[in-house]
Each structure stands twice: as structure tokens, then as C-alpha cells.
Amino acid sequence: MKIGIIGAMEPEVAILREQISNMETLSIAGCEFYRGELAGHDVILTRSGIGKVAASIATTILLDRYAPDCVINTGSAGGFDPELRVGDVVISDEVRHHDVNVTAFGYEPGQLPQQPAAFISDSKLIEVATQVMHQLPELQSRIGLICTGDQFMCDPDHIEQVRQTFPAMMAAEMEAAAIAQVCHQFKVPFVVIRSLSDIAGTESPSTFEEYLEVAAKNSSAMIVAMLKQL
């Protein structure tokens, strides 16, 4: 199986890259592509850069050049669900933009024209992630809504506004909805696996810096375990 894996930052891809054998590296438009074998699969690990535009560029190149059978987005996120803690893993059942608003024209909050309100994760990939959840009980994992915006969520007023608009939201980050939208348009299955580096709030910047490596380790462990099941 040919699998694309996308992470935004170096710490989010480094652990996985170390485990790839027979690796070839390609740089295009500021994106890094590492192709080789991981857990018996042909894997293209992609470092996209931060934010929705960077993620869209990287995902488009990945899908057009390598044509993977599915895409997994890895990395860190900020927690929104009060039951979640730093280091916990959130698996997307759907992904939405939280910083899009064209409701004046009858669209749902977060919905772009000519796009669905939510991008639905692949049921088979969710099923595999669910199996892995039981195999890795040391990782606290939940399945739910992940929302994306070109914003680091640390302003309390803004956090409350987003929470009211998307009450089911478990985690926020800066790339997943863009990746999901490109996958939707290419008709490629996807899922998002994110570990929490912080809980959205005023302490988020310092917590993020402290726990990014923990989040990267946990999300990478989940993905390697998933690859072994696919």
C-alpha cells in the first residue's frame, strides 16, 4: 500500500523519518518529501510547512506526483475538550475550518462555497485507528472533530467564540482542514492523527514549546502502529 503522511514541522516528521528505510529525498516549492519503506508500506513522508496554504501546496504535490492510496496527517494540536490532557491523541472523524465565515450567503460556519461543511475521515482508517487505541492503552485517545485555522489559539475571547461556534470541537491546529479539502477534491481517503502539545488558552505558547516533542512522539507511535495494521 502506498501511504502519504504529512506533518508541518521538523519535530512532527523526524521520528517517522528515522524509521524509513531505502529513503529518497525530494524538495519542491519549500516542501520536503521522504519516500521509502516503513512498516512494510511504500511511504511518502511530507514536511509541508506551517499553515493552510503551505499544507495545501504540499498535499497537492504529494497527490499529483506520488498518487498515494491514502493520506494521514500527523503532528500536534491544541486541546479544546475539557477532558483531554497534554499528550492525548485525537483522531478525526471529521475536519472543519474554524476561521472561515461566509454565512451571509447561507453557508454553515467554516464552510467554503462549493465545499462540504465538514470533510469526513475515511471509515477504514478510523477503524484501524480504533484498533490501535486498544493496543496502545498508554496513549489516551479520542475520536472527534478537529478544526483548522491560520491562528494559534491563545486568546481567551477568541477561544470562547470558536468554542461556541463549534461545541463538538476536540482539538485545533493549522493544517488539517486544508489537507482534507485537497484530499476531498482528489477523492483520496484521509485521517488526521494529532497529539496535544497544549490546551488552548493563555499558557498555550509556553506549553506548546515544552511538549511539542511529546506530542510528536505520541502521534508518531499511533501512526506506526496503524501502518502495521493496514
Swiss-Prot record:
Gene3D superfamilies documented for this protein: Nucleoside phosphorylase domain (3.40.50.1580)
An example Gene Ontology biological process: L-methionine salvage from methylthioadenosine
Catalytic activity, reaction form: S-adenosyl-L-homocysteine + H2O = S-(5-deoxy-D-ribos-5-yl)-L-homocysteine + adenine; S-methyl-5'-thioadenosine + H2O = 5-(methylsulfanyl)-D-ribose + adenine; 5'-deoxyadenosine + H2O = 5-deoxy-D-ribose + adenine
Family as reported in the entry's similarity comment: Belongs to the PNP/UDP phosphorylase family. MtnN subfamily.
Principal EC category: hydrolase
InterPro entries documented for this protein: MTA_SAH_Nsdase, Nucleoside_phosphorylase_d, Nucleoside_phosphorylase_sf
Annotated GO MF terms: adenosylhomocysteine nucleosidase activity; methylthioadenosine nucleosidase activity
Keyword ATP-binding: no
Name of the gene encoding the protein in the UniProt record: mtnN
Keywords: Amino-acid biosynthesis, Hydrolase, Methionine biosynthesis
Described purpose of this protein according to its UniProt entry: Catalyzes the irreversible cleavage of the glycosidic bond in both 5'-methylthioadenosine (MTA) and S-adenosylhomocysteine (SAH/AdoHcy) to adenine and the corresponding thioribose, 5'-methylthioribose and S-ribosylhomocysteine, respectively. Also cleaves 5'-deoxyadenosine, a toxic by-product of radical S-adenosylmethionine (SAM) enzymes, into 5-deoxyribose and adenine.
UniProt GO cellular component terms: cytosol
Protein name: 5'-methylthioadenosine/S-adenosylhomocysteine nucleosidase
Positions that bind substrate: G78, M153, M174, E175
Active-site residue list: E12 (proton acceptor), D198 (proton donor)
Matching Pfam families: PNP_UDP_1 (PF01048)
EC number: 3.2.2.9
Pathway: Amino-acid biosynthesis; L-methionine biosynthesis via salvage pathway; S-methyl-5-thio-alpha-D-ribose 1-phosphate from S-methyl-5'-thioadenosine (hydrolase route): step 1/2
